[in-house]
Each structure stands twice: as C-alpha cells, then as structure tokens.
C-alpha cells in the first residue's frame, strides 16, 4: 500500500530472508517486499484467489461488487529501482522480447532505456507480479480488475513517487505485462485534474478514477470526466465522512472562475 508493504502479515515481516525486501543502492533494506520475491508474489496470489472465491460465494445473485482493485498505489518509494541481489541479476540481463519489439531497442535495461531504465525495470517487475496475482483471482471469480497510480508530481523523479507504478509514461509496459487489468487508474490529488483525466482516458484504458480530492473545485470535474471522457467511476476519497450541510461546503472563490 502506497509504495510500502505495511499491511503484510506479521509472519511475513519477520521472515525477511524468505520474503526478501527491496534494497537501495547503498544496500539499505526497505519496507517494501521485492516484486522479484516469487514466494511473496505466490502468497499474494493465493490470498487474492481466496478473497475472490469468497466474494463469488457471498455475493452470488446480488452483484454488489462490480470491480476489484489489486494492490494500492504500488511502486517503490525512496529509490528508482530495487538493488537486491535478484534484482541486480535481472537488471543486467537483456530486456524481454516484447519490450524490445515495442520500443525498438535492444540490450540490457541500462543500454535500452538509459536514464529511464530503473523506472521501466520496476514497471515491468510490478506489472508482471500483478498479472500473476490478478489472473489467479479471476480464475476464481472473473470480476473486472484494475490497479491505481500515485501520480508523478514535484520533484518529478522516480522514487519521489512510487517508481514502477502505473504512471502514464509506463502504461505501454503495464498493458503488455498485465493484460488481465482492464484499467490503469489515477488517484488524483494534484491541481491539474483535467490533464490527468485526459491522460488516463484512451482506447484500451477506460477512465476509472477510484480516488480524487473531495473539495468543491474537484467536484466540478466529475462532469468533465463523465461527459467528455465517459468515465466508469469518479470517487471522491472519504466522501462518506464529509457529512456537511450544503451551506458548510467550501465554495470556489469567484475569481477562480474568471478567465
């Protein structure tokens, strides 16, 4: 969640040898289990599969649950990529054939993608892990599944936002490596809401906004999302906690509407 493995079970946190963590270039272990840890990904797949089977059984005949989010704002905070032993070995290998063909490049990750190599490497790793998890769950109950993005923002370098997460620049990698996800969805807490809406709405990626600020200015963008971009979802975060009387809701300042 939010670039860290804060909600994994205690027994997994304690066994950091089997469920190994990502590392910074300095060797410092992070609070994020590495996406290169097959044992951890397999446990996640098994848990998600059981959850989907439970929903199928409990929601039979009702259809209350219409979509599932897999993970939350996935990625790696504090470094552009994982430097653990397994990650180092993978990073030194040649890029996957599908990416070589897609980008018309070749060689190792560093040779193929230069300064973007770390983020592209992590995008492929996280997307591949989510594909294993998602496809397992959908075998139990084929609900539409998506994952959400912590958006790029100042200071704009990978690791200041979760590196490898589904930001727009790596959508091609995510779409290739995680085809079971019907949408890559933005969590919008930035002022340039319209630009994000447009960036995440394109053929092959229906607009699905699972989180957006719950203020007066942002509320108006729901019309733009639904009418201009045919959004499937526009969900102000924590709206159920607002509970304000209409006269108590903050109104946009008049000057903000002036050209």
Language-model regions: role of each:
Residues 2-4, 74-79, 154-157, 218, ...:
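Short catalytic/ligand-binding loop motif for oxyanion handling, primarily in non-cytosolic enzymes
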Residues 13-171:
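Polysaccharide-binding and catalytic clefts of secreted carbohydrate-active enzymes
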Residues 7-8, 82-87, 91, 162, ...:
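Short secondary-structure boundary/capping segments
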Residues 1-12:
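Short intrinsically disordered, low-complexity coil segments enriched in acidic
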Residues 132-142, 169-259:
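Catalytic-core region of carbohydrate-active enzymes that cleave or remodel glycosidic bonds
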């Amino acid at each position: 969640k939010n670039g860290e493995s804060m909600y994994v079970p205690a027994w997994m946190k304690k066994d950091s040898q089997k469920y190994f963590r990502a590392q910074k270039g300095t060797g410092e272990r992070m609070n994020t289990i590495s996406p290169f840890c097959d044992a951890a990904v397999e446990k996640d797949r098994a848990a998600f599969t059981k959850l989907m089977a439970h929903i199928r059984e409990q929601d039979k005949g009702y259809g209350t649950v219409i979509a599932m989010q897999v993970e939350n704002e996935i990625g790696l905070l504090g470094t552009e990529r994982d430097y653990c032993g397994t990650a180092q070995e993978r990073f030194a290998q040649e890029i996957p054939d599908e990416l070589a063909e897609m980008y018309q490049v070749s060689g190792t990750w560093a040779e193929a993608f230069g300064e973007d190599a770390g983020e592209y490497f992590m995008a492929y790793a996280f997307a591949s892990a989510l594909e294993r998890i998602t496809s397992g769950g959908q075998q139990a109950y084929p609900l539409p599944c998506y994952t959400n993005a912590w958006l790029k923002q100042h200071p704009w370098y990978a690791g200041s936002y979760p590196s490898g997460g589904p930001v727009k620049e790596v959508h091609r990698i995510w779409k290739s490596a995680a085809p079971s996800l019907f949408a890559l969805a933005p969590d919008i807490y930035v002022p340039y809401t319209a630009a994000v809406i447009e960036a995440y709405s394109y053929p092959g990626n229906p607009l699905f906004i699972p989180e957006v600020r719950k203020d007066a200015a942002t509320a108006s963008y729901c019309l733009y999302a639904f009418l201009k971009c045919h959004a499937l979802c526009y969900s102000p975060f924590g709206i159920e906690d607002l509970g304000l009387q209409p006269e108590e809701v903050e109104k946009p300042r008049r000057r903000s509407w002036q050209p």
